Amino acid sequence: MQNVNEAPTYIHQFDKDEQIISTQDLSVFYGGSVQKLFNASLQFKKKTITALIGGSGSGKSTFLRCLNRMNDKVARVDGEIWYHGLDINKNNINVYQLRKNIGMVFQKPNPFPKSIRENITYALKANGENDKQKLDQIVEESLRAAALWDEVKDKLDKSALAMSGGQQQRLCIARALALKPEILLLDEPASALDPVSTSKLEDTLKQLRTDYTMIMVTHNMQQASRISDYTAFFHLGHVLEYDTTENIFTNPKGEITEDYIRGSFG
């Protein structure tokens, strides 16, 4: 296989007015000197789904967590992350506000041990919203957006822990949407779900694309090809190729990308 340090990179570029968030020479170090991400420069288009693919340890989840500063306490992050004209990798950024605008859904569903309703309203109340009518409206809007309202509208005061795994994951999406983010980061959101729940989740994400920008880590290449508009391929901490999903899967430009897509390694 071609040496990753000698491999050419093929990175799609967007016009400035198409971008919602971008990175420039983003590098991540653990323990002070162990580098896990090398000079990643990517631009993300508004209201699209981008899949981040690559083998285990390729750097895709490390990259994703940089976008809303989830790596702050565990790693050193060098480089720039541009969002609305601000480099959000700077120390003067309000990280709490940033995470309202750039929400995250994790690999394993993590509902609060509270009612379905309280899962949605908890953060809203913490931000000072106490108007019951407004809270009820946001609960319904968020659950509808996550394609969950019809399944739970008569169970809002029941424990979220009694829901199925697929429902819990969609609840976590609804919980993030309640804060009105522009961007939703998803770290292998379907990896713990059965095929039926995965299909429902994918349908939900495709519907959300009209209003939100989504960036999703996945090991499932079939999933990436089904629902994403763009795909970035990570290998050993390097972004080697970034293009439309159709091009990545049918006409990859890089030798290592082609080997990965064909299943020569994982």
UniProtKB/Swiss-Prot annotation:
It catalyses: phosphate(out) + ATP + H2O = ADP + 2 phosphate(in) + H(+). Its main location: membrane. It is a peripheral membrane protein. Pfam families: ABC_tran. Keywords: ATP-binding, Cell membrane, Membrane, Nucleotide-binding, Phosphate transport, Translocase, Transport. One of its GO terms (biological process) is phosphate ion transmembrane transport. Residues 21-261 form the ABC transporter domain. SMART domains: AAA. PROSITE patterns: ABC_TRANSPORTER_1, ABC_TRANSPORTER_2, PSTB. ATP binds at residues 54-61. InterPro entries: AAA+_ATPase (IPR003593), ABC_transporter-like_ATP-bd (IPR003439), ABC_transporter-like_CS (IPR017871), P-loop_NTPase (IPR027417), PstB-like (IPR005670). GO terms for cellular component: plasma membrane. Its EC number is 7.3.2.1. GO terms for molecular function: ATP binding; ATP hydrolysis activity; ATPase-coupled phosphate ion transmembrane transporter activity. The complex is composed of two ATP-binding proteins (PstB), two transmembrane proteins (PstC and PstA) and a solute-binding protein (PstS). Part of the ABC transporter complex PstSACB involved in phosphate import. Responsible for energy coupling to the transport system. Belongs to the ABC transporter superfamily. Phosphate importer (TC 3.A.1.7) family. This is Phosphate import ATP-binding protein PstB 1. The gene is pstB1.
